[in-house]
Structures are given as C-alpha cells and as structure tokens.
C-alpha cells in the first residue's frame, strides 16, 4: 500500500493501476491456492486439528453420538477456506480505497459480511424450525444444517464485502 499510495501522490495513475493489478493477481493466486489446498486437504486438516472426531462414524453407528462431527468439520472447512481467500481480496480493496482517501465503504463493507451471516441464520432457523427465534425446536440434524447454512452465509457475506468495494 505505501508504494501504491506514493504512485498516486506522484500523479502516476497508470503505474499505480498496474501495481495494484499485479498485487491483486499475486493475492488471488496465493489466496486461491491456499483455499484450494484447504478444500482438497480438509480431511487431513481436521484430523490434525480435531483428532477426537476420528471415531465419530463408529460412535454414531453405535448410537452414542447424534452426528458425525468429523464429517461436519470437513464440510465447514471446505466452505470456510474459500471464504478466507475472498476476505484477503477484500483487504486488498480496502487498502486501495484507503489510498484514495475513501474510508466509508471499506469500513462499512464488513457489516455486509455480518449481516449475511445473521440473515442466513435467521432465515435458515425459520425454515428449519418453522418459528423464528426457537432454537430449542431444532433437531440435531437441523442444527447441523444451520451450521452449514451459516458457513454459506459467511462465504456469501465475504463476496458481498469484497464486491461493494470494487470500482
């Protein structure tokens, strides 16, 4: 950002644009690569971070556990890693806008991320329970679905947060 800001101050918008584009390309490649690795290697990641979940399939079959936490964790990792990549790109947009002394949109944009998560939780909870604000009415399966809905909402919110900052 300091180099980009200096190019803007020196009234070199073409060079600044090329520099910002190059940085965006690098961030897109790096964040996209990490997101892809997270999706592909979600099972080993969960195995390392939550080894206690490994025997969940057997425990669910035996009736001692209501759902398979390992499978759920793998599914959430596969949604959250791409979301994190989108948030990296959103931070790039924030830096570019700040360099142009545009502060409102970059600092309001994260509210869209939060609003998307909240909206999907309320909407998903209503659809699954039939009553807003009644989490006790949700079964274990419905709570699992609600967690996945929240993850999708977070990913969608990240896209909104990034999208509103684009020129």
Q: Where do the protein language model's features map onto the residues?
A:
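Membrane-embedded alpha-helical bundles of multi-pass transporters/translocases
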Residues: 1-167
């Amino acid at each position: 950002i300091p180099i980009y800001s200096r190019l803007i101050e020196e009234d070199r918008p073409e060079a600044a644009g090329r520099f910002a584009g190059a940085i965006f390309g690098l961030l897109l490649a790096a964040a996209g690569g990490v997101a892809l690795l997270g999706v592909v290697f979600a099972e080993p990641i969960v195995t390392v971070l939550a080894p206690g979940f490994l025997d969940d399939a057997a425990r669910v079959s035996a009736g001692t556990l209501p759902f398979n936490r390992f499978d759920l964790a793998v599914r959430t990792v596969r949604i959250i890693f791409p979301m994190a990549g989108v948030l990296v790109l959103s931070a790039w947009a924030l830096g570019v806008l700040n360099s142009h002394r545009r502060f409102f949109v970059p600092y309001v944009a994260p509210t869209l991320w939060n609003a998307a998560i909240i909206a999907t939780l309320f909407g998903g909870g209503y659809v699954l329970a039939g009553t807003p604000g009644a989490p006790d009415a949700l079964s274990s399966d419905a709570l699992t679905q609600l967690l996945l809905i929240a993850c999708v909402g977070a990913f969608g919110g990240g896209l909104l947060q990034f999208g509103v900052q684009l020129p």
